[in-house]
Amino acid sequence: MRSEAERQRSFRAWPHTCRTVSPAELARSGFYYLGPGDRVQCFSCGGVLRSWEPGDRPDTEHRKFFPSCPFLQVRRGPPGGTDSVDGQILGQLSGEEPDRTWEPVCPQMAGEGDRLGSFSTWPRYANGDPQQLAGAGFFYTGHRDHVKCFHCDGGLRNWEQGDDPWTEHAKWFPMCDFLLQVKGEAFIRSVQESFFSSPETSPESVGSYEGSPVSSPGSPPVCPFLSTSVAQGALQMGFKRNRVSSLMINRFILTGSCYGSVSELVTDLIQAEEIHGTESVSVPRAPTQRERPEPPKEPAPPLSTEEQLRQLKEERMCKVCMDNDVSMVFVPCGHLVVCTECAPNLRHCPICRAAIRGSVRAFMS
């Protein structure tokens, strides 16, 4: 996808209802069509943007949310043709392979018979006909009702009665080349337009799931970075939670990495105090005569290894599907609460309810 012409070709499945921004301008700014809806991704930094509004300029939005993108930093020369990007620099700075491959991800499942054979252990309670699923390019992963496309590696689950595999394939993975070859552009475009123009799937309604971990009214949103040992170390020194949370989120969004040590975080906290005031550190005052010191509390018993592992697994679990690990950071709120499969379904952050303007893939160590 380094070629602007190749990125423009990716927009052949771009829904006609998405008229707020030009596909040509998106391709010129480094984006190719990802889907579903109006989701696009930068070929260089991997940044994803969606929910385009009238007046949005792709190049401006790209620089706003992904200022460290190698494509933006090293791009030179007039737009059009092949973008002049240093391949060596791009290889060092980009987290993903930018060139799109049209080869199947799982070639061993390229045959429909092989895919159908994978459904030998398909649960009886599961919805979805194995014959139809296999015909639409899916094979069974062996877990619950999870299936994957052999070509694009797109995964689907939680099948309901009446779901059509081809329609779901086109809805969530419109750039799959196998889907494009079999069903054609017209089918994909019709699915995209019918689904993402309906009121039930508008940006205002998608993502309002019951049971989502939404903060109660008046309470501050929970920052996932505060559970790290680095953040806990700073909090124990007396720094304010909101200041620690803000710095850690900004650091991750701007650099893609977290603070490596408490001292590094404390240095930035002190610098922030010098700019915004020194009220971040709370100094305990001596008790007055009328105050009686509280008796020391007994230390809590140490957690067992099993309990620590359980808590760690719970912290890293996707808060929507409760199955995969969290891996997507929402922009601009910075919350890290969902996996790559659930992120495309959300239009608002399930934690703070802020509108999701983009997302960045996070790789947990």
Curated annotation (Swiss-Prot):
Coiled coil: none annotated. One of its GO terms (molecular function) is zinc ion binding. GO terms for cellular component: cytoplasm. Residues 186-234 are annotated as: Self-inhibits the anti-apoptotic function. Its EC number is 2.3.2.27. Auto-ubiquitinated, and degraded in a 2-step mechanism; a caspase-independent first step and a caspase-dependent second step. The modification Phosphoserine is found at S198, S202, S212, S216, S219. InterPro entries: BIR_rpt, BIRC2-3-like_UBA, IAP, Znf_RING, Znf_RING/FYVE/PHD. Residues 278-306 are annotated as: Disordered. Zn(2+) binds at C149, C152, H169, C176. PROSITE patterns: BIR_REPEAT_1 (PS01282), BIR_REPEAT_2 (PS50143), ZF_RING_2 (PS50089). This is Baculoviral IAP repeat-containing protein 7.
